[in-house]
């Protein structure tokens, strides 16, 4: 009788264990494996608590162009790129909120390129890349909701639990879905190297002085980032890394420079527009770009040698 009871209990438990294992493996295979957003956040959680000196925020302009390895080699700076492709400022804000649950960096470096965003809601790919790596939390929930229009708020749960959004990927599976190595992002500290070379024409924008307004929602969340950093007493180094800047973008960043004058010293904000420092960096437009938006390894080296020296000179991380 006792054996029958044990068998009666163990059979369903065994079935549940097998089912759980199968679902976990299925989830692993079907899940999105973007290494330009999701992996950066997933590997961030594996960093030792309070081990990050410099938290890098932004879009691909940040995670392709800022190399934590060079910052460490040149200045002993422990940096991590917590970024995602095409990331609007509302998702960046919630990335920062989430990061502060686990780390208290001594400096935030934020690339400002996405201030050119004029849409009020996230594109599907940007929403996924900016939220799917996050643990289940209020920050993830609010980030998803911020990225959806009022008419789509009822869909937020799909992105919160993730699986419903990618359960139909069976026909799209490739070999990479079974062997994808997410751990490399932990080793690269969120950096995404690009090695190709694409000759570019140097932008000539020195005479562009007009200003174009920054989208209200984009600016509101950017301000929240600065306010949160101030509350946490973390200085902010805003950067505009080298890319082939358009006249329209230049007018947006002229507006940014005007707005930043309204922030007093208590915010500890510094802004460097590297698009005005091509010669100082030694940028070669024939050899240092991968495409219109990103430097290649040669250009990245030049940018990060400068950045490491600047951080060492202007910020004291102590011990």
Model-predicted regions and their roles:
Residues 51-53, 77-78, 104-107, 231-237, ...:
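Loop/turn elements at helix/coil->beta-strand transitions in domains of secreted/extracellular proteins
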Residues 57, 61-145:
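Membrane-embedded segments
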Residues 7-28:
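Hydrophobic membrane-insertion alpha-helices, especially the h-region
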Residues 125-232:
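Secreted/periplasmic serine-hydrolase-like ester/acetyl group-modifying domain
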Residues 29-50:
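Alpha-helical transmembrane signal-anchor/signal-peptide segments
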Residues 288-319:
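Histidine-centered active-site loop/cap adjacent to the catalytic His
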Residues 217, 223-224, 230-232, 237-293:
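Extended hydrophobic/aromatic segments used for targeting, binding, or gating
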Residues 66, 91-94, 136-139, 143, ...:
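Extracytoplasmic/secreted proteins, especially bacterial periplasmic and envelope-associated proteins
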């Amino acid at each position: 009788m006792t054996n029958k009871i044990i068998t009666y209990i163990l059979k369903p438990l065994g079935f549940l264990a097998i089912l759980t294992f199968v679902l976990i493996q299925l989830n692993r295979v079907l899940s999105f494996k973007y290494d330009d957003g999701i992996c950066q956040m997933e590997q961030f959680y594996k960093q030792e608590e309070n081990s990050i000196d410099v938290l890098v925020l932004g879009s691909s302009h940040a995670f392709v162009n800022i190399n934590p390895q060079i910052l460490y080699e040149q200045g002993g700076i422990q940096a991590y790129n917590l970024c995602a492709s095409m990331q609007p400022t509302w998702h960046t804000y919630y990335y920062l909120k989430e990061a502060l649950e686990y780390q208290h960096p001594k400096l935030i470096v934020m690339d400002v390129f996405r201030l050119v965003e004029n849409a009020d809601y996230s594109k599907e790919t940007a929403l996924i890349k900016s939220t799917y790596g996050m643990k289940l939390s209020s920050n993830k929930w609010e980030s998803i909701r911020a990225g959806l229009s009022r008419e789509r708020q009822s869909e937020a749960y799909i992105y919160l639990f993730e699986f419903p959004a990618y359960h139909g990927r069976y026909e799209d599976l490739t070999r990479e879905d079974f062997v994808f190595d997410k751990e490399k992002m932990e080793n690269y500290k969120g950096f995404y190297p690009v090695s190709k070379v694409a000759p570019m024409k140097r932008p000539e924008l020195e005479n562009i002085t007009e200003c174009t307004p920054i989208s209200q929602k984009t600016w509101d969340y950017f301000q929240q980032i600065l306010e949160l950093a101030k509350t946490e007493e973390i200085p902010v180094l805003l950067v505009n890394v080298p890319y082939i800047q358009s006249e329209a973008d230049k007018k947006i960043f002229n507006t940014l420079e005007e707005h930043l004058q309204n922030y007093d010293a208590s915010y500890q904000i510094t802004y460097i527009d590297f698009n005005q420092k091509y010669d100082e960096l030694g940028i070669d437009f024939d050899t240092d770009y991968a495409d219109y938006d990103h430097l290649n390894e040669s250009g990245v080296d030049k940018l990060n040698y400068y950045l490491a020296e600047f951080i060492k000179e202007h910020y004291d991380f102590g011990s």
